Amino acid sequence: KYKTKSKIDPLNFFSKLSKTNLAPEAFMIRDKNYSIISCSPENLITKKGSNISTKPIAGTVKKTKYLNKIKALSYFRKNLKETKEHNMIVDMERNDLSKICKVGSVKLSKQKIVEEYKDLFHYVSLIKGKLKKNINNYEIIRAMMPGGSVIGCPKINTLNLLNNQEKENRNIYTGSFGYIKFNGDMRFNIIIRSILNFKNVSEISVASGVVVDSNANHEFNENFLKAKALIDLFK
């Protein structure tokens, strides 16, 4: 968690961020008491009619002049830690969707693809399903939140463990922001890569997935990499 005292212009920050690190789930909230500027790349729920999808991210590598999108895909496929982490999260999200979807309808639409951002590449999958009859939005949100990629597996046990281990509240971090239409369609992201400014204190939270093959130094450096686009706004 990075913190700094700063009086910021949320609209200016968001405008800069949209130009330098455009992300599909980006958003900004400006209130008289606080503001949130986000370049979140991760979609948790997209519901249109009876169709639902989730797009978990699990896997990160630094972007360099020697590492293009094709080489990044090769890196992810050969890296045992990244593969284990990704498989774990995908399995968990498929399980969450299976609670609310018709039997046999949950499918991997896109499996282990690479998405490119300003400073990094992400390892991403897209999972789709057909909702059971009479499933309401409350049941969907309850089944899908919090997102598996920011919790871990097994979900309930990990949540209990995190409650005991984490000394500070996450605030908005790893929550969700989105909308529900009058027709019931909805879209929610996962709040990562975000700045929370409250009482002229800006806060950036980052984290990484840990499995048995994880290396502490690698995970620490990955966290800084994830925060870099946001930290650069203060320069």
Q: Where are each of the predicted segments found?
A:
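Extended alpha-helical targeting/anchoring segments
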Residues: 1-235
